[in-house]
UniProtKB/Swiss-Prot annotation:
Pfam family, one: UPF0253
Upper taxonomic lineage: Bacteria, Pseudomonadati, Pseudomonadota, Gammaproteobacteria, Enterobacterales
Family classification: Belongs to the UPF0253 family.
Transmembrane portions of the chain: none
Alphabetized InterPro entries for the sequence: UPF0253
Range of residues in the leader sequence: none
Protein name, as recorded: UPF0253 protein YaeP
């Protein structure tokens, strides 16, 4: 957990304690958010590219590993 930012560690603690809901389909949750980020014109092109690249890698790994 040390390598993740404070906000991620905070949300992790909230989910682990039951204060925040757990999403069983974690991959689907991540892909939904990355897709929203990649499509958001309000974000910088660099951030959108990072989101798109991460999502594409997850999709490839999900299909390749099945």
């Amino acid at each position: 957990m040390e390598k993740y930012c404070e906000l991620i560690r905070k949300r992790y603690a909230e989910i682990a304690s039951g204060d925040l809901g757990y999403v069983p389909d974690a991959l689907g949750c991540v892909l939904k958010v990355l897709n929203e980020m990649a499509a958001d014109d309000a974000l910088s092109e660099a951030v959108r590219e990072k989101a798109a690249y991460a999502a594409a890698n997850l999709l490839v790994s999900d299909y390749v590993n099945k």
